[in-house]
Swiss-Prot record:
It is found in: Secreted. Residues 25-35 have a biased composition (Acidic residues). InterPro entries: Dermaseptin_dom (IPR022731), Frog_antimicrobial_propeptide (IPR004275), FSAP (IPR016322). This is Dermaseptin-H5. Belongs to the frog skin active peptide (FSAP) family. Dermaseptin subfamily.
């Protein structure tokens, strides 16, 4: 009987450890996803700012050519 009790408690302990490991992996994956999303948003913002700057520079050049 005591051997079954030891085996049962060992299985329960192992199950709990595996569950905690899965939860930690899920949390790490979620953090990685959030960081990737933030990086994507940052690159999108940088791209939009660059695009607007290029448009403004192009308009300035065309405006100066039109004045000549």
């Amino acid at each position: 009987k005591s051997l079954f009790l030891v085996l049962f408690l060992g299985m329960v302990s192992l199950s709990i450890c595996e569950e905690e490991k899965r939860e930690n992996e899920d949390e790490e994956k979620q953090e990685d996803d959030e960081q990737s999303e933030m990086k994507r948003g940052l690159w999108s913002t940088i791209k939009n700012v660059g695009k607007e700057a290029a448009i403004a520079a192009g308009k300035a050049v065309l405006g100066s050519l039109g004045e000549q």
